[in-house]
Amino acid sequence: MAQSSSAPLQALNVRVYPIFTVRWLAVHVLGVPTVFFLGAITAMQLIRR
């Protein structure tokens, strides 16, 4: 009896996605300074003269 291909064990085409994409750059260019400044502003609120 021949092997049935109704439930393949391995995908035929496996895509390898790049890590650094335009979306990744956009998210990090906007996100990293935003988190930094939010942390800096929060720290400034806690300073008592």
Curated annotation (Swiss-Prot):
Keywords: Electron transport, Heme, Iron, Membrane, Metal-binding, Photosynthesis, Photosystem II, Thylakoid, Transmembrane, Transmembrane helix, Transport. PROSITE patterns: CYTOCHROME_B559. With its partner (PsbE) binds heme. PSII binds additional chlorophylls, carotenoids and specific lipids. The chain crosses the membrane at residues 24-40. Heme binds at H28. It comes from the Bacteria. Its cofactor is heme b. It is a single-pass membrane protein. Its main location: membrane. It is found in: Cellular thylakoid membrane. Pfam families: Cytochrom_B559. GO terms for biological process: photosynthetic electron transport chain. This b-type cytochrome is tightly associated with the reaction center of photosystem II (PSII). PSII is a light-driven water:plastoquinone oxidoreductase that uses light energy to abstract electrons from H(2)O, generating O(2) and a proton gradient subsequently used for ATP formation. It consists of a core antenna complex that captures photons, and an electron transfer chain that converts photonic excitation into a charge separation. Heterodimer of an alpha subunit and a beta subunit. PSII is composed of 1 copy each of membrane proteins PsbA, PsbB, PsbC, PsbD, PsbE, PsbF, PsbH, PsbI, PsbJ, PsbK, PsbL, PsbM, PsbT, PsbX, PsbY, Psb30/Ycf12, peripheral proteins PsbO, CyanoQ (PsbQ), PsbU, PsbV and a large number of cofactors. It forms dimeric complexes. Belongs to the PsbE/PsbF family. This is Cytochrome b559 subunit beta. The gene is psbF.
